[in-house]
């Protein structure tokens, strides 16, 4: 129940990858025929991915994952456009790959506006317009939030960016396999994606860069990826990611409809069968696989540990920050107190999740919640006084 953290590799994806581990293991940058077969596989993958998002093949750049893609997009755009301006607009609920990159740039002379969100995690379009300055060079807003699932008004943001001639980047790591994305209709100039979020391999991602966007390299060295991303291609990873992307988009409508039905069933059971819970994130403009609740009078980490003992995987936020004792920056940004933020639990399903599995998980959450609350003096006091 933690598919937002990562997903299982599909068997069809693994089969597609296998030849490039031990049979056709050549370096695609070499000139001999053996290597050119590997290069052809990389280029076929590039063509496939481009077709899924309405892009040209030469606008797809393979990376090591979402964090690298985010870093590349933000840093390279800032460097390339520093003569034009030094102002970047983003939001307070972005992934840390964006936020920490922006903080790095602030230490190096750039100015960053961190937009507030409402209680559902939604960006205010008017606030974006009001934040634009003559020196604004980049807007970076995630397509959908990784913790609370809220889907942002990306098409409207893209229209604003195009109107003001500002580059628009979106982190679509969570959205890519669940929402049809057309980079042209949404006026997206750069987009980050990571393969392991949609049943592809870890260590493979891509950055879409519109041809009109002239940014430099993040990693320097060889001439791979048209001299914009040095390093030997991860051929099995690239091939596997493309196969996973094709499978995800082939069955997207069916899978999404099923996930929404199961998600809403999951949410309904939690809300109807456990007292003092609060759904985090937008109720309808939400990723089809995301469930995030505050369960009051229950410490989130304790809940997760006890669920883990029952073989149930869940999280209290992003897997990238799971070792931190600080409250989720996303939950505090939507107005939760530190105390309430620490009562949160994120569950995320996949197209393989069944109603029977959800029923098992809900029953375990109910048992664990009852047990933890029985040890909580705050819960006892609240119930007695109300």
Predicted regions and their residues:
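Pyridoxal 5′-phosphate
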Residues: 1-386
């Amino acid at each position: 129940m933690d598919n937002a953290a990562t997903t299982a590799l599909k068997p069809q994806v693994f089969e597609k990858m296998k030849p490039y581990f031990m049979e056709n293991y050549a370096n695609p940058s070499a000139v001999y025929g053996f290597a050119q077969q590997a290069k052809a596989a990389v280029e076929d993958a590039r063509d496939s991915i481009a077709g899924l998002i309405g892009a040209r093949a030469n606008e797809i750049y393979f990376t090591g994952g979402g964090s690298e893609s985010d870093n590349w997009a933000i840093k390279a755009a800032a460097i390339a456009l520093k003569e034009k301006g030094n102002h970047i607009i983003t939001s307070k609920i972005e992934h840390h790959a964006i936020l920490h990159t922006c903080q790095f740039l602030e230490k190096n002379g750039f100015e960053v506006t961190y937009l507030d969100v409402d209680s559902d995690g939604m960006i205010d379009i008017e606030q974006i317009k009001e934040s634009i300055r003559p020196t604004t060079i980049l807007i970076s807003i995630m397509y959908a939030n990784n913790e609370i699932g809220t889907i942002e008004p990306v098409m409207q943001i893209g229209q604003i960016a195009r109107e003001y001639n500002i580059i628009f980047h979106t982190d679509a790591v969570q959205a890519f396999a669940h929402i049809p994305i057309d980079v042209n209709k949404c006026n997206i100039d750069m987009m980050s994606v990571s393969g392991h979020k949609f049943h592809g391999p870890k260590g493979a991602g891509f950055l879409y860069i519109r041809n009109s966007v002239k940014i430099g390299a993040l990693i320097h060295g060889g001439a791979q990826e048209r001299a914009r991303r040095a390093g030997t291609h991860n051929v099995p990873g690239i091939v596997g990611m493309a196969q996973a992307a094709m499978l995800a988009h082939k069955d997207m409508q069916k899978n999404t409809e099923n996930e929404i039905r199961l998600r809403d069933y999951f949410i309904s059971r939690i809300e109807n069968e456990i007292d003092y819970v609060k759904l985090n994130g937008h109720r309808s403009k939400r990723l089809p696989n995301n469930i995030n609740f505050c369960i009051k009078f229950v410490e989130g980490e304790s809940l997760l540990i006890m669920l883990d003992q029952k073989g149930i995987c869940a999280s209290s936020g992003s897997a990238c920050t799971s070792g931190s004792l600080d409250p989720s920056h996303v939950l505090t940004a939507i107005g939760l107190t530190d105390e309430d933020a620490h009562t949160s639990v994120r569950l995320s399903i996949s197209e393989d999740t069944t109603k029977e599995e959800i029923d098992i998980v809900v029953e375990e959450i109910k048992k664990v919640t009852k047990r933890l609350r029985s040890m909580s003096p705050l819960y006892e006091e609240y119930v007695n006084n109300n």
